[in-house]
Amino acid sequence: MTPTMRKFHPLLKFINYSFIDLPTPSNISASWNFGSLLGLCLIAQIATGLFLAMHYTADTSLAFSSIAHICRDVNNGWLLRNLHANGASFFFICIYFHIGRGLYYGSYLYKETWNIGVILLFLLMATAFVGYVLPWGQMSFWGATVITNLLSAAPYIGSNLVQWIWGGFSVDNATLTRFFTFHFILPFIITAVSLIHLLFLHQTGSSNPTGLNSNLDKVSFHPYFSYKDLLGFVIMLGALASLSTFAPNLLGDPDNFTPANPLVTPPHIKPEWYLLFAYAILRSIPNKLGGVLAVVLSIMVLFLMPIIHTSKLRSLMFRPIAKTFFWALIANTAILTWIGGQPVEDPFITIGQIASGLYFLIFVLLIPSLGLLENKLLKI
């Protein structure tokens, strides 16, 4: 019998053991679809971004006009731009669901895979931030000014660091050029880190909803889960196409349709919706350095998850008390997202401070203590 080429060819062998003959737990739910959806988002963003970069001009006097030119004069340019802008929102929706699934089902106990995933989240946030500056609208300019200015809170080197990033004494042409460079290169770095993420995942195999060892009950990835992923692709691409054609500016900011003007400050400076929860945490601390540290820690706290997991059970499926607080964390993050989009006035300031405190309280105190409590109650 002739040996199957995909099992022996050096290149095909890697693809085969990653996407075809990969042993996969038979009971993984649709929650496990988000990893492949993130891969699709990355491919879509690189593809649309590459075509947009062909027509974009990274110059303060031409950037805004070049976006208008893409939308008006380039064949299907409006569609490329809308797919790219809304594709970023879908990217974040998928990554937040992916992280939520990891927290719910205890996937963070695969330490290397989890830690690389958190690094990917940082890279994605950086890419989205520098990308938001490129259209050079009012919110682009003032968002860049406010967020980069936060680095001045760093002791001793702060002001020098900000000027180094700006390439001058204010956000100007040099800033836009380097932000475009970063926005172009970061997706390729994300692709490389994603491959490392997959490499570590395939060392251990996927977890499953029960949190139990699934070695006794595995099936090949293809055709069972490849078709399941394909259904996810169809649903997500359909939703993205619908949003990009019927309501392309639904998630954007109207201020960004006004060219950047350093002399006029918008009434309310805010980032895109997917970074609002971090922005709310930033604003809830009255001290500048404290706010910056709180934002960084709000993501870095995810690195602690494998360390603070004290329960003998992996998944929240069999942990009713911890499950309640998991959903409280989700609700709390939704409240922070809402607060980040509101003006800085009461009662929003107070709500933001309470929600920020609860966010860290759930992670640092409640997760480890609930694990110990449930062990005691279950006598395990």
UniProtKB/Swiss-Prot annotation:
Cofactor binding summary note: Binds 2 heme b groups non-covalently.
InterPro entries from the UniProt entry: Cyt_b/b6_C (IPR005798), Cyt_b/b6_C_sf (IPR036150), Cyt_b/b6_N (IPR005797), Cytb/b6-like_sf (IPR027387), Cytochrome_b (IPR030689), Cytochrome_b_C_euk/bac (IPR048260), Cytochrome_b_N_euk/bac (IPR048259), Di-haem_cyt_TM (IPR016174)
Any one GO cellular component localisation term in the record: mitochondrial inner membrane
Binding site for heme b b562: H84, H183
Membrane-crossing residue ranges in chain numbering: 34-54, 78-99, 114-134, 179-199, 227-247, 289-309, 321-341, 348-368
UniProt main location, coarse: mitochondrion
Pfam families xrefs: Cytochrom_B_C, Cytochrome_B
Superkingdom of the organism of origin: Eukaryota
Sequence positions that bind a ubiquinone: H202
Entry GO MF terms: metal ion binding; ubiquinol-cytochrome-c reductase activity
Record membrane topology: Multi-pass membrane protein
Subcellular location: Mitochondrion inner membrane
Cofactor needs: heme b
Binding, heme b b566: H98, H197
Key words of the record: Electron transport, Heme, Iron, Membrane, Metal-binding, Mitochondrion, Mitochondrion inner membrane, Respiratory chain, Transmembrane, Transmembrane helix, Transport, Ubiquinone
Note: Heme 1 (or BL or b562) is low-potential and absorbs at about 562 nm, and heme 2 (or BH or b566) is high-potential and absorbs at about 566 nm.
Assembly with partners or alone: The cytochrome bc1 complex contains 3 respiratory subunits (MT-CYB, CYC1 and UQCRFS1), 2 core proteins (UQCRC1 and UQCRC2) and probably 6 low-molecular weight proteins.
Family listed: Belongs to the cytochrome b family.
Known role: Component of the ubiquinol-cytochrome c reductase complex (complex III or cytochrome b-c1 complex) that is part of the mitochondrial respiratory chain. The b-c1 complex mediates electron transfer from ubiquinol to cytochrome c. Contributes to the generation of a proton gradient across the mitochondrial membrane that is then used for ATP synthesis.
Protein name (database record): Cytochrome b
Organism phylogeny: Eukaryota, Metazoa, Chordata, Craniata, Vertebrata
